[in-house]
Amino acid sequence: MQFIDQARISVRGGRGGDGIVAFRREKYVPAGGPSGGDGGQGADVVLEADSNLQTLLDFKYKRLFAGIDGRRGGPNRCTGASGPPLVIKVPCGTEVRHLSTGIVLGDLTTHEERLTVAFGGRGGLGNAHYLSNRNRAPEKCTEGRDGEEWPLQLELKLLAEVGIIGLPNAGKSTLISVLSAARPKIADYPFTTLIPNLGVVRRPTGDGTVFADIPGLIAGAAQGAGLGHDFLRHIERTRLLIHLVDGGAEDPLLDLRVVEKELEAYGHGLVERPRILVINKQELIQEEDLDAIVSALTEASGRTPLLVSAAMNRGLDDMLDRVWSELGI
């Protein structure tokens, strides 16, 4: 499945139906009064969160969504039928912005949560509204009004409690695959992960906690370099970050600083987010280098790193104990 996490669409509420001019034409009522009915209300356009959807892919192929127009009024003061709401399904975690102003209109995070993004136009008035002492047979009615029309920006931000971050090839996909039932593509080269991967990790209570493996960041990610710029938004909702550092890298300290710099540059409070520092690929670290690497990372980050090997399933229980403790579980 192709992962699309941004989309631009246009929404337009239905036009209100027109009011009509009509007069009573009944037996024994030779000069009936005005009886023109009002037009129906145009359809609203509504976004609805659906937990069964994982991507905004559908909006790649259809970008204009218009509600049904209201029906015109009828004789005998009959109001025209209103257009039923046009309901558009989006994934849970979709943030909706007005494209022109950037104003956030809503944030759909729970299943079946709804947001009206364009109201339909009001129906026009029939001539029955214009009866007066001076005008007993009004010929006046009004047209229905146009519905609202707006350009919108949809942004999907994954709903995960724990985000796994780090440079490309730090072992994030291997870690999430070992911890959960997720099966991301894994290989020994940078940028294997091109989309965020979600995995559910069982808590001690038996409930599940969603972990997100965020595609690798590189220097300049917050300004658009590499893959990180498009996916940093997915860790905005997380409660906790696992910062994974490749223990077998040429310079683990430099790798640490690159990611921390990108979190700070991106903003949105990410640099203050609770974080666990984890050195992965413990098996690749020479025994004589281990203390120096741990000491350097501790001094630079102010955090004592945990040592794990995702590939060999070492140290992961201790890491999860820290995760549950940080989350208050």
Curated annotation (Swiss-Prot):
Domain named OBG-type G is located at: 160-328
| Residue positions binding ATP | 166-173, 191-195, 213-216, 280-283, 309-311
One Gene Ontology term from the biological process aspect of the record: ribosome biogenesis
What's in the keyword line of the UniProt record?
A: ATP-binding, Cytoplasm, GTP-binding, Hydrolase, Magnesium, Metal-binding, Nucleotide-binding
* EC numbers, comma separated: 3.6.5.-
Q: Which cofactor does it need?
A: Mg(2+)
Q: Give the binding site residues for Mg(2+).
A: 173, 193
- Cellular location of this protein? Cytoplasm
Q: Name one GO molecular function term.
A: GTPase activity
GO cellular component annotations of the record: cytoplasm
Q: What Gene3D superfamilies does the annotation carry?
A: GTP1/OBG domain, P-loop containing nucleotide triphosphate hydrolases
Which protein family is named in the record?
Belongs to the TRAFAC class OBG-HflX-like GTPase superfamily. OBG GTPase family.
Q: What does this protein do?
A: An essential GTPase which binds GTP, GDP and possibly (p)ppGpp with moderate affinity, with high nucleotide exchange rates and a fairly low GTP hydrolysis rate. Plays a role in control of the cell cycle, stress response, ribosome biogenesis and in those bacteria that undergo differentiation, in morphogenesis control.
Q: What is this protein called?
A: GTPase Obg
Q: Organism source for this protein?
A: Synechococcus sp. (strain CC9311)
